[in-house]
Amino acid sequence: MKKLPWSELHQGFSAVLSSVNNIETVISYGNVLAEHESITGRAALIDLSHRTRIRVTGHAAAYDFLQRIFTNDIPRPGSFKCCYTFMLNPQGNIITDAFVFNWGDSYIIDAEAGMVDKLLDKLKSQASNDINVSDASGSVGILTIQGPIAQDILEAWLLGEELPADVFSAVKIILPDGKDVLIINNPRTGTGGFDIIADVESGPLIVRRLFKILGALDCRLAGWQAFDIARFEAGIPRFGSDIDPSVIATETGLAEKAISSTKTDFVGFDVISRHSNPNSMNSYLRGLRLFNDIQVLPQKGDLLEYDDQVVGYITSSLASPKFHANLAFGYISKDFNKIGNILTLRSMNFESPAQIVELPFSKNFV
């Protein structure tokens, strides 16, 4: 298991550490439900440094390279901005999703945990000699503050500094130790939030300062488990569970967010252009509400049927503490994926109705 950069720091806060995709991760600080409530009701600080971080340098050449590799418009050098995007193969299948941050003269690719070797091989095999691609897991960390009052926490930390107002906009801040950090407006759980990209050496000072502010504002540290529950409740699919290489990008419901409407030269464009119309897609990722009386949540691959015909399958599920309901994601054939349709979920031990609902899930619990 690969160690987390700030492992000892978190142990001082009584963190529960375990593995996500063979990477050490802060799972919780001992009270997942309280941490989740802090994220959704006020705000919480989460260490996302278990995720893959890759640095790409090469000035204009790096920008041109990433523009070809990724589906969305990459921030220009020196813009200090971010985008959410896909990396595709020529068949239009998703290799990974990622956030790509411009950090002055370099780019940081932030992807799902455990993807370092795969993405390094993929990027290095296509990069020219004037582009450097390296593993940044040991040198760069990612913290995120998520929740309705996330901005209040940052304002209390960065007195007088102007924060990025628009989603995916960013600002560079110089810390008292002379190190610079990147602050990005990035609502990862649907209620507002900011990422903090910092050198590993600066992390402990940042966390300790923010910890004091959290306490003063009745907020707390939160682990990956609470963060992932909030992410699910916000209707945001996760790579490895709801998005994987078997899926064409346009089937995920994320095309508007992750794919440029003007670029035509990225890998996989020809396939994506043929599947831009919903009628051309075989299936589509939908949210599902399951009946409350089921005893066991469905597993990835459990089938969805309509009139005894298999029309889809489950990708992930959750007993939501926020909505007090059983929820799921699943891919459903285009002829049966209308909002409101009621399907039959067939699991190993039971069958149950499953209703297709709008995303984000909050729209169904007004």
Segment roles from a protein language model:
Residues 69, 121-125, 157-159, 206-215, ...:
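Short amphipathic alpha-helices in soluble, non-transmembrane regions
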Residues 61-104, 146-188:
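A glycine-rich (often HGG/GG-containing) alpha/beta subdomain
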Residues 59-60, 112-117, 148-151, 199-204, ...:
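Helix N-cap motif at beta-to-alpha junctions
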Residues 73-74, 124-132, 161-162, 210-222, ...:
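A common structural junction motif
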Residues 107-110, 192-198, 325-333:
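A generic structural motif
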